């Protein structure tokens, strides 16, 4: 068994903290929350301190922040229905179009596309058209309820979204007319899907839900060895594993480490749990076991967790309790 060692507890935000995001270099991170401010933190010596506070971009709670793959830009999604793009401590662009709260924002791996989603049930795809210019490339209305999270595939221009309608949707650009289409609907959860994350190679996806489970989904491409039918020659996603009985309340976030393959979950029971794929796991019927659980990681709901993209085993979390914590996994 492994265990999580608490390395740092950081305070600075007023009220609940909704999101944290590691910089691609892994040596700094951004945080956001109820106080309408974004904080950029970096390490000097053995302490983490706020280097910058970005406070003039939004009128309401900031739900999520995400760095561009190059690390030059930061996008923030807010309940004020806008998404702001920041560079060098300035707000360079504000993306408007959603009718109400923007819940999530994500950059494609190339950095050329941005996705946003909202309580208005829509997913928007934006093209980076030049210096601080963003053009709406698509408005996708595949979900029937509030959309909670958008995440791009790690190498392909495929987008995944998770919703209050209990489903996950996949989108890709059509080769025929360059329109964006919903290519798959992933149904198995029995309540809101709060978050999703791809495995490093993008062939599997983990999801977490209000139904207290995690699910692992696998992509089956046309001509797959398993003999899974692929109508219209499109990739089919199947739920190949359900992790149940490990969380006592809603699971709000999940992070699949691109370095170690470990999965971290953030839960409404104030806990953080780490899952590891079993050594005898089968390709089409994988099994994941609980490696370690930090039952009282925070004093209130844990809203987000994210593995450091560079430093294996380092995990960041944030909570309604107004703190950010940095953990080190000892296996």
UniProtKB/Swiss-Prot annotation:
Chain positions of WD repeats: 12-51, 57-96, 97-136, 142-181, 188-227, 246-285, 297-331
SUPFAM superfamilies: WD40 repeat-like
The keyword Repeat belongs to this UniProt entry's keyword annotation: yes
Single Gene Ontology BP annotation: protein maturation
UniProt KW Repeat keyword: yes
Domain of life assignment: Eukaryota
One Pfam family matching this protein: WD40
Disulfide bonds: none
A single cellular component GO annotation: metallochaperone complex
InterPro entries: CIAO1/Cia1, G-protein_beta_WD-40_rep, WD40/YVTN_repeat-like_dom_sf, WD40_repeat_CS, WD40_repeat_dom_sf, WD40_rpt
Alphabetic keyword roster: Repeat, WD repeat
Cross-referenced PANTHER family: CYTOSOLIC IRON-SULFUR PROTEIN ASSEMBLY PROTEIN CIAO1-RELATED, WD40 PROTEIN CIAO1
Function per UniProt: Essential component of the cytosolic iron-sulfur (Fe/S) protein assembly machinery. Required for the maturation of extramitochondrial Fe/S proteins.
Recorded family membership: Belongs to the WD repeat CIA1 family.
Protein name: Probable cytosolic iron-sulfur protein assembly protein Ciao1
